[in-house]
Amino acid sequence: MLSREEILEILSEYDLEDLSIATLGSHTALHILKGAKEEGLRSVVVCEEGRTTPYERLGVADEIIVVERFQDMLDEEVQERLRELNAIVVPHGSFVAYVGLDGIENEFCVPMFGNRRLLRWESERSLERKLLKRAGVKVPKVFDSPEDIDRPVIVKFPGARGGRGYFICSDPEEFEEKAERLIEDGVIDEEDLEQAHIEEYVVGTNFCVHYFRSVVEDTVEVLGMDRRYETNIDGLVRMPAGDQLEAGLEPSYVISGNIPVVVRESLLVQLYEMGDRVVRASEDIEEPGFIGPFCLQTLCTEDLEFYVFELSARIDGGTNVTFLPYAYLKFGEIVTMGRRIAKEVREARDKGLLEGVVT
């Protein structure tokens, strides 16, 4: 595991007046890069061959580093170029998925915005639940074995899959039937099934709440929220019930887009309290706790109580909706999560706090 001291030693050799914000060319890269430029920082993207077009045509990247595969971001040549550019790398879901947690923790010797140690806590269900339970927020009941299923549950699998392979069932027999079908179709394998996370299906409305823990301002901000647009479930529910039954299609929950939403103003108090609790718990678990963006994926029940069913320990894909209403209220202008990150980096540099926002 790379120590924070090793990363800070690298940071100490940077020309702080010539900083870059860098990221992998996927997920939320467009907003991260645009935000860097808006705050007067150089923007750098590491991109796979054949995937540079959006960054070129939209003009958001000052430099494009082309690699054969995303995993090549770990190559020493690429890392050296990032250090030459005085780059601070912003992690996102694709970065975690392609570069890998072991690579990020042990091999990636470039300063990263945020707490790299917390990325594992979002990827492993048992760790994620431990953090949420420590925070004291409401979470769905978890079932240790398919044999214990006695109510509607949703079955999830490890890693950043964007909902692929998830399914709902109500008893052990239905679990076995649906799991076997997914294995036959090549969606999951036996190893995935052994690591299946089975949790109570909470009926409620979906709010994915986008937070920002600011070291510079010493506060936790709620910037905006979205809900997921999932295929094929969102298409199925548009069909009459009789047609759904006749079609015999198995619902899937693969995220294909995001829809901006706002919550009733009276519920914001709960959301701020949840964010504060999660940040305090993260400080106890992996110092210095959350830095910058994180997301709580929640369900709001008919009793107007929030259950947290998933955590993102970095910028979440839902921030691609651009307009974050509470960020607008705070800053008086449209501030994307990408720009909020760059603003924190710039202000931390200007106030001598940069060591506090990287690991």
From Swiss-Prot:
<feature type="binding site">
    <location>
        <position position="27"/>
    </location>
    <ligand>
        <name>5-amino-1-(5-phospho-beta-D-ribosyl)imidazole-4-carboxamide</name>
    </ligand>
</feature>
<feature type="binding site">
    <location>
        <position position="230"/>
    </location>
    <ligand>
        <name>ATP</name>
    </ligand>
</feature>
<protein>
    <recommendedName>
        <fullName>5-formaminoimidazole-4-carboxamide-1-(beta)-D-ribofuranosyl 5'-monophosphate synthetase</fullName>
        <ecNumber>6.3.4.23</ecNumber>
    </recommendedName>
</protein>
<dbReference type="InterPro" id="IPR016185">
    <property type="entry name" value="PreATP-grasp_dom_sf"/>
</dbReference>
<feature type="binding site">
    <location>
        <position position="310"/>
    </location>
    <ligand>
        <name>Mg(2+)</name>
    </ligand>
</feature>
<keyword id="KW-0436">Ligase</keyword>
<comment type="pathway">
    <text>Purine metabolism; IMP biosynthesis via de novo pathway; 5-formamido-1-(5-phospho-D-ribosyl)imidazole-4-carboxamide from 5-amino-1-(5-phospho-D-ribosyl)imidazole-4-carboxamide (formate route): step 1/1.</text>
</comment>
<dbReference type="InterPro" id="IPR010672">
    <property type="entry name" value="IMP_biosynth_PurP_N"/>
</dbReference>
<dbReference type="InterPro" id="IPR009720">
    <property type="entry name" value="IMP_biosynth_PurP_C"/>
</dbReference>
<dbReference type="GO" id="GO:0006189">
    <property type="term" value="P:'de novo' IMP biosynthetic process"/>
</dbReference>
<feature type="binding site">
    <location>
        <position position="94"/>
    </location>
    <ligand>
        <name>5-amino-1-(5-phospho-beta-D-ribosyl)imidazole-4-carboxamide</name>
    </ligand>
</feature>
<feature type="domain" description="ATP-grasp">
    <location>
        <begin position="116"/>
        <end position="340"/>
    </location>
</feature>
<feature type="binding site">
    <location>
        <position position="258"/>
    </location>
    <ligand>
        <name>5-amino-1-(5-phospho-beta-D-ribosyl)imidazole-4-carboxamide</name>
    </ligand>
</feature>
<dbReference type="Pfam" id="PF06973">
    <property type="entry name" value="DUF1297"/>
</dbReference>
<keyword id="KW-0460">Magnesium</keyword>
<feature type="binding site">
    <location>
        <position position="297"/>
    </location>
    <ligand>
        <name>Mg(2+)</name>
    </ligand>
</feature>
<comment type="similarity">
    <text>Belongs to the phosphohexose mutase family.</text>
</comment>
<dbReference type="Pfam" id="PF06849">
    <property type="entry name" value="DUF1246"/>
</dbReference>
<keyword id="KW-0658">Purine biosynthesis</keyword>
<keyword id="KW-0067">ATP-binding</keyword>
<dbReference type="GO" id="GO:0000287">
    <property type="term" value="F:magnesium ion binding"/>
</dbReference>
<dbReference type="GO" id="GO:0005524">
    <property type="term" value="F:ATP binding"/>
</dbReference>
<keyword id="KW-0479">Metal-binding</keyword>
<dbReference type="InterPro" id="IPR011761">
    <property type="entry name" value="ATP-grasp"/>
</dbReference>
<keyword id="KW-0547">Nucleotide-binding</keyword>
<comment type="function">
    <text>Catalyzes the ATP- and formate-dependent formylation of 5-aminoimidazole-4-carboxamide-1-beta-d-ribofuranosyl 5'-monophosphate (AICAR) to 5-formaminoimidazole-4-carboxamide-1-beta-d-ribofuranosyl 5'-monophosphate (FAICAR) in the absence of folates.</text>
</comment>
<dbReference type="InterPro" id="IPR023656">
    <property type="entry name" value="IMP_biosynth_PurP"/>
</dbReference>
<dbReference type="InterPro" id="IPR013815">
    <property type="entry name" value="ATP_grasp_subdomain_1"/>
</dbReference>
<dbReference type="GO" id="GO:0016879">
    <property type="term" value="F:ligase activity, forming carbon-nitrogen bonds"/>
</dbReference>
<keyword id="KW-0464">Manganese</keyword>
<feature type="binding site">
    <location>
        <begin position="146"/>
        <end position="208"/>
    </location>
    <ligand>
        <name>ATP</name>
    </ligand>
</feature>
